[in-house]
């Protein structure tokens, strides 16, 4: 009987190994989901003031001081894609008080970097003093850019 038990031992060991469940294969390596790059939202880059612009709508000679009869240009650089609504609010500034001089809005579909212009003129002459132009983007209550300038 002892010999039979000893003879069965190796067979049982082999049988046990054959019945052993194999481990599941490792999961396939994960791949990162493809990233979708959204185009940048419209934004205001720079605002340059001057009394003349070129065909590219850029101010030819930047200035922050103007004569009483000057036409004052604000060249506004934008970037990004999508619908853009730019509003220029020109104001006379005296201490803490401001008085609106002019307000102009333009709308366009932006396909990338662009330059737009706003301007104000007063043929009878600007009163001497401090002024500012605020550029608003897409109905935001906060100006995207503000530039101050003097007349006189």
Regions from the PLM with identified roles:
Residues 1, 28, 93-97:
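Serine/threonine-rich low-complexity intrinsically disordered regions
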Residues 38-128, 134-147:
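Contiguous segments within soluble domain cores/interaction surfaces
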């Amino acid at each position: 009987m002892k010999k039979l038990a000893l003879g069965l031992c190796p067979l049982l060991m082999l049988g046990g190994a054959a019945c052993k469940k194999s481990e599941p294969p490792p999961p396939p390596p994960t791949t990162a989901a493809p990233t979708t790059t959204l185009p940048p939202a419209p934004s205001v880059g720079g605002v340059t003031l001057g009394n003349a612009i070129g065909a590219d709508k850029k101010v030819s000679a930047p200035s922050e001081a103007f004569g009483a009869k000057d036409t004052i240009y604000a060249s506004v650089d934008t970037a990004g894609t999508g619908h853009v609504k730019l509003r220029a609010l020109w104001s006379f500034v005296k201490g803490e008080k401001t008085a609106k001089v002019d307000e102009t809005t333009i709308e366009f579909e932006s396909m990338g970097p662009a330059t737009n212009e706003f301007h104000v003129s007063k043929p009878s002459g600007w009163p001497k003093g401090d002024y500012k132009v605020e550029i608003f983007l897409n109905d935001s209550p906060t100006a995207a850019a503000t530039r101050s300038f003097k007349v006189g």
